[in-house]
Amino acid sequence: MSVPMTVKVQNLGRFLSAMIMPNISVFIAWGIISGLFIKSGWCPNQTLEKVLSPISVYLFPILIANTGGYLINGKRGAIVGSIAVVGAIISTAIPMLLGAMIIGPIGGWITYYFDKISKYKVKSGFEMLVNNFSVGILGVLLLFISFLCIGPMIEKLSCFLGYVVNLMINNHLLPFIAILIEPAKIFFLNNVINHGVLFPLGIQEVVKFNKSIFFLIESNPGPGIGVLMAWFFFGCDNIKKSLKEAIVIQLFGGIHEIYFPYVLKNPRLILALILGSITGIFILIVLRGGLISAASPGSIISILAMTPKGLYVINLLAIIISFLVSFLVSCMLLKISNRNHYVKGSNTKIEKDNFLINSSFQKNRTCIKSSLDSHKCIRNIIFACDAGMGSSAVAAGILRNKIHDLNIFNITVSNAAIDSIPNFGVDLIITHYSLTDRARKRNSNAKHLSLNSFLDNAFYNELSKYLVENNLDNNSSILDFSVRNQNNFSSKKNVFSLTKENIFLGQIASSKEEVIRFIGRQLVNQGYVKEEYIEAMLEREKMMSTWLGESIALPHGTIQSKDFILNTGIIFCQFPNGILFGDDPEDIAHLVIGVAARNNEHIPVVSNITNILDNNDVIKSLSITKNIDDVLYLFSRKNI
């Protein structure tokens, strides 16, 4: 498979995952109700069992279509997708999950192109009329199309897939689906198979039989743990600590990406994964195991929670035996590899780069020093993975703890999905090497580092050392701001200083426009900006709300208004009664911080502000205090 095609398939999997994952809690809730109240459940109840059918028939497809439309064109796309999928639901007799994955995005695209075409053609004063009626009309039209065409087509496709699956089961071929699934997982293509095929088939099967084997095919942690355990016994000593962590994360955290790098270091281990998975599927078929809903993440805890009454032994047996098969095969393959890497007539083993994982440690050290500009100040680091919820979250947590132990408080470490990486405001992006090309396409301005393993402890140690040496040297050109009061003053080179004159407590306003004008006026009065910057701040707010969440808003000017900025500075305003700053009624800001930053100085300024306000207790204190010195103290306490 070519690289561009691989990226396309990964993107498709990411999009399917983005439709399913936000709604996974609903499927879990449905599984809990099913496990409790169906005839074979823990507390059989025919009355409460009646809620299962409406949820699976109506709620699942509508939620998925809503999410799919929202991903393409926000709320308007979500509404059209939700309306349209009803047509497909009532035209068929099967759960319309696959149809929802198609109809939802179609609704989003239709509204997107309609909005694009009509953007400058609606007369002033008719915007609300056009917006409301266009969504209703487009939704009705797509509903008719779904009812007449898309629904019946999806039903035929589902019947065909069901026929193929039954054919495989009757001919004892279903276990061999592992030949496709296990290699696909290693190359981050599992979301396409899992959410595009196995998940819809699983829901259809559960409706009929109150359980499905398809929910346990991809989520079975046994084969992956088998590979990790084999590495633990036959790998080199200095990776055993990370392997212990990987095994715990794989088993209880359900993050399967953890074992991918260990397989890629010795691709022959894919055979162990395949054989382990085949064994597990075979046991589930013979003993009729399965789950009542999706186990997400693929943790042993999730699997046990979604196991129907009476099937605990069967499901655990399938997981354990698949682990043993994978472990034994992996041990044999690693022993063969070790034997092949001994020098003939000597007891000295040659540790080749393409075999031992610890050989990647030295590569990481060299990579960090050669890839990063020693004069660049790194303040915002993002770990990215395909979905942004598994391995990247683990990696971000590891680095965050390390830099915290080193008393580094002015660097932000976060995680994100590849396709959610912002195209500005990021200094360093770290990904698995198979995803680095996609990350570079999302943001070509930031520095990029590639990892073989997200549990490579040596990498984090070297990166932490680099950050200390290059970002915290007193002689380096750190872009920062200090907090000045009688007891606190930083002698470092600063972008600006926060003083009592920048802080306004107990303010009252009737609208966010009034707030922005007040802040803009203070920026002008204190010599930070020219008069024109006030209108630029209002213009920027019309483009998109500067509401950040957690009671905070950060109004600033447009990119074009940088010529109106004289000096970098902020104005801190407190509104105890709150001001509506976002699009939703709940988006109330109590802390409004106006920003004016020259050149690229907005990046460290915003990063530092968000670092300070990353604690709910700090936000609460700043929202109610009546003493300016309290604000100065809370800012200075964060060592900014």
UniProtKB/Swiss-Prot annotation:
Protein location: Cell inner membrane
Segments forming domain PTS EIIC type-2: 12-343
Pfam families attached to this UniProt entry: PTS_EIIA_2, PTS_EIIC, PTS_IIB
Any one GO MF annotation of this record: protein-phosphocysteine-sugar phosphotransferase activity
CDD domains from the UniProt entry: PTS_IIA_fru (cd00211), PTS_IIB_mannitol (cd05567)
Induction (record text): Induced by mannitol. Repressed by MltR.
GO cellular component: plasma membrane
SUPFAM superfamilies in UniProt: Phoshotransferase/anion transport protein (SSF55804), PTS system IIB component-like (SSF52794)
Gene3D superfamilies: 3.40.50.2300, Mannitol-specific EII, Chain A
Site positions for Stabilizes the transition state in the phosphoryl transfer from HPr to EIIA: 540
Phosphohistidine modification, residue list: 556
Bilayer disposition of the protein: Multi-pass membrane protein
Entry protein name: PTS system mannitol-specific EIICBA component
